[in-house]
Amino acid sequence: MEAKPVAMEVEGVEAAGGKPRFRMPVDSDLKATEFWLFSFARPHMASFHMAWFSFFCCFVSTFAAPPLLPLIRDTLGLTATDIGNAGIASVSGAVFARLAMGTACDLVGPRLASASLILLTTPAVYCSSIIQSPSGYLLVRFFTGISLASFVSAQFWMSSMFSAPKVGLANGVAGGWGNLGGGAVQLLMPLVYEAIHKIGSTPFTAWRIAFFIPGLMQTFSAIAVLAFGQDMPGGNYGKLHKTGDMHKDSFGNVLRHALTNYRGWILALTYGYSFGVELTIDNVVHQYFYDRFDVNLQTAGLIAASFGMANIISRPGGGLLSDWLSSRYGMRGRLWGLWTVQTIGGVLCVVLGIVDFSFAASVAVMVLFSFFVQAACGLTFGIVPFVSRRSLGLISGMTGGGGNVGAVLTQYIFFHGTKYKTETGIKYMGLMIIACTLPVMLIYFPQWGGMLVGPRKGATAEEYYSREWSDHEREKGFNAASVRFAENSVREGGRSSANGGQPRHTVPVDASPAGV
């Protein structure tokens, strides 16, 4: 006899008056079990669109300067060291901001945390139009770059809105379409500059006015998040805390369980050489092609844009691949997928540094490299939601922050000053990708196994997630959401577990928002 699936799918939860609360099918944790890309169904898909669009706008703001760097460089008299320092500043600002954002998501929710961060960093974008010195350029890039911490709220949001079989895809699309801003801005800013210049502005004035476009985009996105976003399927954090439907956790507990989970540290390291590499390329690729192959500003922008624009399918593709591998091989499939794809990306990065003698070969390899390194980002956040439930936000922040740390270190070591030629730095960066992906082999979940070792006999997901709660907290039912997540994650054990595995239940599963 065929076993019944453990995850309970509900075609819209009945609310007062017998009307369905959701237009989308949900599981017992009220998370959507489907992903309707072109829908705006609230709260799941509306929050998805707010998450990726706000992150997209932050990416546009952060990398609005590099496409206009030849003009900014001449106006402000920037040296190679100034440019390198500013590039480092643009990605270093978000290191601690991402950790803070993860904690804020755990404590106050992704909606308020995201909108607050975006509004606080928007003035720096507008100030880009009035800078007069290299130090001013460095400062605006630093403070604008802090907005990249909105990535953490986007990933936390998707992990809160979509069930385990769809979380990799949701995280991949939200992150990928957000990162798309890094490519779109390579086209946008030169076009805006040209339009303003043709109207009659001098080059000195035109590039300054152009910065108002990313500033306005960022302002609008923050307002949209507040107006249309929702923290959780059951409501916003404030409401859920007041009604007692959600346990209000303490910072100390959230921090302790995040810092003591070694899986989060490994993912932070590997993400440092997937997303961190992507940030580094966003900073150097435009100038590299402009100087190395003597192309014009628009052509260099088009080439650089092709790297970032690949995110429209590459990172979502990584998330989709993670979910597909999970459906066949469970968590072990997700881990193998991450290691394989990121390692191939490292090899292609080495090749990119070697073929610098050929313009056509460099462009072709860069495009191929972009697909693999960005897909690795999607595969990473196909795993992150399963590391911890109590400290999901901070684990996401640690991983995201690792991406920025990787970018800072890589840019400082290989692209700062004149120690290495850019093509040599790219080659060494590829070797770092390969080396820093190896620790994925050490990630092990007792209930699901790891890359090289199977699961421990008798271990369950419920047991794994409940360890984050004390006996007293479990008695009060504070771990109810973790238990529901464990039950809905049964397929992470592979096909045999998904088809026949019946995890132990200690907390009744229902469709209420309690404990969400």
UniProtKB/Swiss-Prot annotation:
Alphabetized Gene3D superfamilies for the sequence: MFS general substrate transporter like domains (1.20.1250.20)
Keyword Membrane tagged: yes
Tissue: Expressed in the stelar cells of both primary and lateral roots, particularly at the site of lateral root emergence, root-shoot junction zone, vascular tissues of adventitious root primordia, leaves, germ tips and seed scutellum.
Major location category of this protein: membrane
Location relative to the cell: Cell membrane
Alphabetic keyword roster: Cell membrane, Membrane, Nitrate assimilation, Transmembrane, Transmembrane helix
Keyword flag Transmembrane: yes
Swiss-Prot/TrEMBL induction comment: Circadian-regulation with a peak in the middle of the morning and at the end of the light period. Isoforms 1 and 2 are induced by sucrose in roots. Isoform 1 is induced by nitrate in roots, but not isoform 2. Isoform 1 is down-regulated by ammonium, glutatmate and aspartate in roots, but not isoform 2.
Gene Ontology process terms (BP): nitrate assimilation; nitrate transmembrane transport
Misc. remarks from the entry: Plants silencing isoform 1 of NTR2.3 have impaired xylem loading of nitrate and decreased plant growth at low nitrate supply (0.5 mM).
Subunit structure: Heterotetramer composed of two NRT2.3 and two NAR2.1. Isoform 1 interacts with NAR2.1, but not isoform 2.
Protein name in the entry: High-affinity nitrate transporter 2.3
Protein source organism: Oryza sativa subsp. japonica
Gene: NRT2.3
